[in-house]
UniProtKB/Swiss-Prot annotation:
PANTHER family registered for this protein in UniProt: PSEUDOURIDYLATE SYNTHASE TRUB1 (PTHR13767:SF2), TRNA-PSEUDOURIDINE SYNTHASE (PTHR13767)
CDD domains, sorted: PseudoU_synth_EcTruB, PUA_TruB_bacterial
Name listed for the protein in its UniProt record: tRNA pseudouridine synthase B
Enzyme's top EC category: isomerase
Lineage: Bacteria, Bacillati, Cyanobacteriota, Cyanophyceae, Nostocales
HAMAP family in UniProt: TruB_bact
UniProt record similarity statement: Belongs to the pseudouridine synthase TruB family. Type 1 subfamily.
Active-site feature positions: 38
Annotated GO biological process: mRNA pseudouridine synthesis; tRNA pseudouridine synthesis
One Pfam match: TruB_N
EC identifiers of the protein: 5.4.99.25
Organism: Nostoc sp. (strain PCC 7120 / SAG 25.82 / UTEX 2576)
GO MF term set: RNA binding; tRNA pseudouridine(55) synthase activity
Length: 293
C-alpha cells in the first residue's frame, strides 16, 4: 500500500500517536505525517504510507484553521491544557475593538512560538525544557498569515472569538491567541482549534480512525494516489526512452520555460515517475518514485 490518508485527528492524540496506531492498523512500518497537530487540536492530519513518505517534503505548506480565542485568561501553554497564569474578567471588551487589532496579525509577521512547542533551541525541544522548568528566551520567527475572518463573538466575563485563519507553515495559532490578548492587556488563550485544511487536504473529505478501521475491515479502503496530493505542482510527460533515462538519474533537455519542481509522468502509460526540477530547459531528477526498466 502506498499513497496518502486524509486523517481527521481526534482530540487528545498526538500526531505520533496517530502514526503509531496506523502502523498497527495497516501493518506497515513506513507511515509518516505532514504538519504536526497539537494534542488538543482536531482536524486534518495528512498521513503518508509506503513510498509516499518520500513525497511529504513536496506537499504544499498552506494550512487553514477554525480557532476559538478566549480573552481574560493566560496559561503556560497558551491553550486550555496549561496552568492558568492570570484570570481576569474583561466583559467590557467589544468585538469592534478586537476587529481593529486583527490586521496587525495578517501578512508576514514576527511571531514568538509558545514555550510548549516542538521547536528546537540549541538542540533541545522547547517543551522538554519547559517541563524541566528551564527558562529560555525563544527567538521570534517570521511566519505568514494570509487571512483572519471573524466567524462569531460571544460576550461574557471571558468573551470568546471564533475566527477562520489561513496561514503558511510554522504559524502557531496559540501564539496568535496569546498575542491578541496582549494587545488589550487582558490575556488571551486558545480555547479550541480545528484544522480545516492542510497540504492540499480538506476536513470535508477526511476520515477518522474509526472510519478508516471500518473501511479496512470491509475491504473498501483505498489511499489517495501519491501524485493526487501534489496537484499544486505542474506536470511533465516523457516518452519511454527519456523516461527510462530520467529514472536512471540522467538529465533530460526539454523545450520548456517552466522553472521549479514538477510531477513527472511516462507519456505512454501515464505512470507517475517522481519529482523533477526544471532549470533552464533541463529536467533534473529530484526523487524517483516509480522507476521503470
Amino acid at each position: 500500500m502506498q499513497g496518502f490518508i486524509n486523517l481527521n485527528k481526534q482530540f487528545g492524540w498526538t500526531s505520533h500517536d496517530c502514526v503509531a496506531r496506523l502502523r498497527k492498523m495497516l501493518r506497515l512500518k513506513r507511515v509518516g505525517h505532514a504538519g504536526t497537530l497539537d494534542p488538543a487540536a482536531t482536524g486534518v492530519l495528512p498521513i503518508a504510507v509506503g513510498k509516499a513518505t518520500r513525497l511529504l517534503q513536496y506537499l504544499p505548506s498552506d494550512k487553514a484553521y477554525k480557532a476559538t480565542v478566549r480573552f481574560g485568561v493566560q496559561t503556560t501553554t497558551d491553550d486550555l491544557q496549561g496552568e492558568i497564569i492570570t484570570s481576569q474578567p474583561c466583559r467590557g471588551l467589544s468585538l469592534s475593538e478586537v476587529k481593529t487589532a486583527l490586521p496587525q496579525f495578517i501578512g508576514k509577521i514576527e511571531q514568538i512560538p509558545p514555550i510548549y512547542s516542538a521547536i528546537q533551541v540549541e538542540g533541545k525541544r522547547l517543551y522538554d525544557l519547559a517541563r524541566k522548568g528551564e527558562i529560555i528566551e525563544v527567538p521570534a520567527r517570521t511566519v505568514e498569515v494570509f487571512s483572519i475572518d471573524v466567524l462569531d463573538w460571544r460576550e461574557g466575563d471571558f468573551p470568546e472569538l471564533d475566527v477562520a485563519i489561513a496561514c503558511g507553515s510554522g504559524t502557531y495559532i496559540r501564539a496568535i491567541a496569546r498575542d491578541l490578548g496582549a494587545v488589550f492587556h487582558t490575556g488571551g488563550t486558545l480555547a479550541a482549534l480545528i484544522r480545516t485544511h492542510s497540504s492540499g487536504f480538506n476536513l470535508t473529505d477526511s476520515l477518522t480512525l474509526t472510519d478508516l478501521e471500518t473501511q479496512l475491515q470491509a475491504g473498501t479502503f483505498e489511499p489517495t494516489p501519491a501524485d493526487a496530493a501534489l496537484q499544486c505542482l505542474p506536470s511533465v510527460t516523457l516518452p519511454s526512452i527519456s523516461a527510462q533515462k530520467w529514472c536512471q538519474g540522467q538529465r533530460i533537455e526539454l523545450n520548456l520555460e517552466t522553472i521549479g519542481k514538477v510531477r513527472v509522468y511516462q507519456a505512454e502509460t501515464n505512470i507517475f515517475l517522481g519529482i523533477g526540477e526544471l532549470q533552464a530547459g533541463v529536467l533534473i531528477p529530484q526523487m524517483v518514485f516509480e522507476p521503470i526498466s
